[in-house]
Amino acid sequence: MQTTVTTMLLASVALAACAGGGSTPLPLPQQQPPQQEPPPPPVPLASRAACEALKDGNGDMVWPNAATVVEVAAWRDAAPATASAAALPEHCEVSGAIAKRTGIDGYPYEIKFRLRMPAEWNGRFFMEGGSGTNGSLSAATGSIGGGQIASALSRNFATIATDGGHDNAVNDNPDALGTVAFGLDPQARLDMGYNSYDQVTQAGKAAVARFYGRAADKSYFIGCSEGGREGMMLSQRFPSHYDGIVAGAPGYQLPKAGISGAWTTQSLAPAAVGLDAQGVPLINKSFSDADLHLLSQAILGTCDALDGLADGIVDNYRACQAAFDPATAANPANGQALQCVGAKTADCLSPVQVTAIKRAMAGPVNSAGTPLYNRWAWDAGMSGLSGTTYNQGWRSWWLGSFNSSANNAQRVSGFSARSWLVDFATPPEPMPMTQVAARMMKFDFDIDPLKIWATSGQFTQSSMDWHGATSTDLAAFRDRGGKMILYHGMSDAAFSALDTADYYERLGAAMPGAAGFARLFLVPGMNHCSGGPGTDRFDMLTPLVAWVERGEAPDQISAWSGTPGYFGVAARTRPLCPYPQIARYKGSGDINTEANFACAAPP
């Protein structure tokens, strides 16, 4: 039974922010489907005074880091549900900063945090992951991802978030590529890589114990993209901090992914039409929306039925990687070759386009042919058409919007490219933002990749050391009962889903029986964290809690399409399956209904 704290007056807040190359399948112990979460244990009565006592100068709160300053400790009223957010309970909000200092670049730095503790607490602690290169403190209502309206706070978890140790509004240097300029300061790099999450977790747990009179029973972390990397990092560096972790689309070796960004830019350049103001090929003009959709349809024509059902989803993504080649594929609309035999038309791709996309998708190599990052998956989510609207999720990273007169793809001139130069290259390479696309075009794949392994002066850790989360030694996390769910969209253009699958296979080889504590769910058609022609909506928190607290491993996770118009239907649900299984049609019933599919080995 929950204990309601009737003396609390609390204020509203809004919600903020194919398999891999290995061959070691992981056995999947069979479990019963997850049940509803058990009622939380009773918590001690708290009060307005207990909340306000967390403010500096009140009470005798001892923080794990003495350099902790509380700036807000206030009651917040319950907030009603809206179209985009679940109702929030009354709660105590505490926000502050840890380790205020001045960096070697002359800019001020601090590790900001925001904590929310509900009046009716379920005894659980929750941290939400960041995004991009962080630098923004979210509302900290505990986003659980998967397109969910519910948040951890709405489910009565105590929730916390951090900005990662720098502030995009403060640490914005236009001469050092803007908001990624924190990379000029060595400590800010370490804070963003791992230190801030350790510091904020400790602070949050201490405040929770003080406020409620006892420690949390279990602790959970959910993040996607950079937040997914943070989750993997926590399981490796700080295995005792969290009992359950969800790591979505993890940029666990993001510095390498940045190298891939330069590779895709240079690979696509020969197909570009026109130049930008700096004389750089307009990568966004290399494929029109219709061209990219034609490629997506050709992938479906080759791969859709490889799972036993032609339904607009490539479930057998492993077989697809071996089967599809744009140079030999057909346009399913007319049965003619996808690659133009003569002049370019609306029904085919030019030989230059085909060569460009094949080179880009194969992944970067140096002059000796050594891979520098992973390959990318051929998947229908590279485009998609809902009504008359083309999916932009994939192209926004590699190409940018077709109608733009400037290069605006994340990997060409956006934060993905900029962060590599200032945050991950050592020493950092500050420059005006107008020069980024040209720098990507001049990237040397023999020399520049060495910079993610380099140290220099006060930069005593390489970016792969402070930011990478590549370890497969999760013994400490496993041995204390930790559980981790990884997920990744097959059409993610930020980080390769095949790279995450390769990590999972390495984990299985290093730790036999890894499926007993870690499982990977690949999502066909989904783009980066969400979107695309796939079932991109799901709740990972409920099955995670069931696994951690009741030992019920997730043998499948229910998912549904956020944009069923991609399939020309009103709704579509499917099971997400633990790698290496895929969703297979049972042979009868509505193909848009999850119950008519089962998780099984690919055909």
Swiss-Prot record:
GO terms for cellular component: cell outer membrane. Ca(2+) binds at residues 304, 307, 309, 311, 313. Induction: Highly up-regulated during growth on PET film. The active site is at residues 225, 492, 528. Pfam families: Tannase (PF07519). Residues 24-44 are annotated as: Disordered. It catalyses: 4-[(2-hydroxyethoxy)carbonyl]benzoate + H2O = terephthalate + ethylene glycol + H(+). A lipid is attached at residue 18 (S-diacylglycerol cysteine). It is found in: Cell outer membrane. 4-[(2-hydroxyethoxy)carbonyl]benzoate binds at residues 132, 226, 411, 416, 528. Residues 26-44 have a biased composition (Pro residues). Involved in the degradation and assimilation of the plastic poly(ethylene terephthalate) (PET), which allows I.sakaiensis to use PET as its major energy and carbon source for growth. Likely acts synergistically with PETase to depolymerize PET. Catalyzes the hydrolysis of mono(2-hydroxyethyl) terephthalate (MHET) into its two environmentally benign monomers, terephthalate and ethylene glycol. Belongs to the tannase family. This is Mono(2-hydroxyethyl) terephthalate hydrolase. It comes from Piscinibacter sakaiensis.
